[in-house]
Amino acid sequence: MNLRPLHDRVIVKRLDQETKTASGLIIPEAAAEKPDQGEILAIGNGKILEDGKVRPLDVKVGDRVLFGKYAGQTVKVDGNEVLVMREEDIMAIVQK
């Protein structure tokens, strides 16, 4: 991928969601909600503060994160859909 996000933006790849329920029912792709978890593919340099200083981001490439259903802007890169969002749209980092 040849995208480098600016400032406090990150590029996230949505993680595949389970298509089968706990009871074994298969959920059709059209009925499944978009996953709200993803993996950070790239990060910007940091948030520019009012005093002009740059605060580094809390997330790093490879982190698994949780975000809101409507967070970010979907873009296609090399035929793959990714999300470009601000770090503030990320709700949590999933601990391994």
Curated annotation (Swiss-Prot):
Q: Which InterPro entries match?
A: Chaperonin_GroES, Chaperonin_GroES_sf, Chaprnonin_Cpn10_CS, GroES-like_sf
Q: Name one GO biological process term.
A: chaperone cofactor-dependent protein refolding
Provide the Gene Ontology terms for cellular component.
cytoplasm
Database matches in SMART domains: Cpn10 (SM00883)
Q: Which UniProt keywords apply?
A: Chaperone, Cytoplasm
User: Is the keyword Chaperone in the record?
Assistant: yes
The GO molecular function terms of this record are:
ATP binding; metal ion binding; protein folding chaperone; protein-folding chaperone binding; unfolded protein binding
Q: Which Pfam families match?
A: Cpn10
* Location in the cell: Cytoplasm
Which residues are in coiled coils? none
SUPFAM superfamilies (UniProt xref):
GroES-like
Q: Which PROSITE patterns match?
A: CHAPERONINS_CPN10
Chief location of this protein within or outside the cell: cytoplasm
**Record has Cell inner membrane as a keyword:** no
Give the record's family classification: Belongs to the GroES chaperonin family.
Name the NCBIfam families on file.
PRK00364.1-2, PRK00364.1-5, PRK00364.2-2, PRK00364.2-4, PRK00364.2-5
The UniProt function text for this chain reads:
Together with the chaperonin GroEL, plays an essential role in assisting protein folding. The GroEL-GroES system forms a nano-cage that allows encapsulation of the non-native substrate proteins and provides a physical environment optimized to promote and accelerate protein folding. GroES binds to the apical surface of the GroEL ring, thereby capping the opening of the GroEL channel.
Tell me which HAMAP family the record gives. CH10
Q: How does it assemble?
A: Heptamer of 7 subunits arranged in a ring. Interacts with the chaperonin GroEL.
Q: What is this protein called?
A: Co-chaperonin GroES
- List the top taxonomic levels of the source: Bacteria, Pseudomonadati, Pseudomonadota, Betaproteobacteria, Burkholderiales
The primary gene name is groES
